[in-house]
Amino acid sequence: MRVILLGAPGAGKGTQAKFITEKFGIPQISTGDMLRAAVKAGTELGIKAKSIMDAGGLVSDDLIIALVKDRIAQADCAKGFLFDGFPRTIPQAEALVTAGVELDAVVEIAVEDEEIVQRIAGRRVHEASGRVYHIVYNPPKIAGKDDITGEELVQRKDDTEETVRHRLSVYHSQTKPLVEFYQNLSAKNGGKPKYSHIPGVGSVEAITAKVLEALS
């Protein structure tokens, strides 16, 4: 099962990725992990990527695609793989097609922006223990205080409304167009890869059931 999972930051992709990889026995592949592994292993591509990153440059799509082809040829990808946060842009998606990388399914987990803002901006964290609360869905017994220690809860910088809205605007301009790209690709190729749009609201179990049904 060769899968791409699409969706905005905070849509719940991480949770669903875990269920998919366990169910199908496939690895979750992110470009970040892939780059780090190639650099660590000192492969030819890894050395190239490291020199670019050390100079503060952006790794080109050509190099990313070469790394992807390398990665999916490894033994743990025999049953397939799940791409996490890749492709991010239309040129990357087109390069994947040109490189002959076949996909079985593209699953979009769709959640409205306002719901995502509420989900993420409502998070509060007890830094020392890592305990996470939510002012609406999982509030502490006393507002702003950790249940166990009574210490102050904080909002992570990444979780502020301003940061979340910025990340969403980047997603809409760069990654959202992939939805249309894969819908068109599927229509053109007689339903391959199979494209599924799944609303990411409701219980985790209900969303997982819909995701697994889409992949069956």
From Swiss-Prot:
Subcellular location: Cytoplasm
Region entry LID, spans: 122-159
GO BP annotations, alphabetical order: AMP salvage
CDD domains: ADK
Annotated AMP binding sites: 31, 36, 57-59, 85-88, 92, 156, 167
Region: NMP, residue numbers: 30-59
Record keywords, A-Z: ATP-binding, Cytoplasm, Kinase, Nucleotide biosynthesis, Nucleotide-binding, Transferase
SUPFAM superfamilies per the UniProt record, alphabetical: P-loop containing nucleoside triphosphate hydrolases
EC number(s) on file: 2.7.4.3
Catalytic activity: AMP + ATP = 2 ADP
Stored Gene3D superfamilies: P-loop containing nucleotide triphosphate hydrolases
Metabolic or biological pathway: Purine metabolism; AMP biosynthesis via salvage pathway; AMP from ADP: step 1/1
GO molecular function, one term: adenylate kinase activity
Chain positions recorded as ATP binding sites: 10-15, 123, 132-133, 202
UniProt cross-references to NCBIfam families, sorted A to Z: adk, PRK00279.1-1, PRK00279.1-2, PRK00279.1-3, PRK14527.1
Subunit structure comment from the entry: Monomer.
Protein family membership: Belongs to the adenylate kinase family.
Entry text on domains: Consists of three domains, a large central CORE domain and two small peripheral domains, NMPbind and LID, which undergo movements during catalysis. The LID domain closes over the site of phosphoryl transfer upon ATP binding. Assembling and dissambling the active center during each catalytic cycle provides an effective means to prevent ATP hydrolysis.
Name of the protein in its database record: Adenylate kinase
Species this chain originates from: Pseudomonas fluorescens (strain Pf0-1)
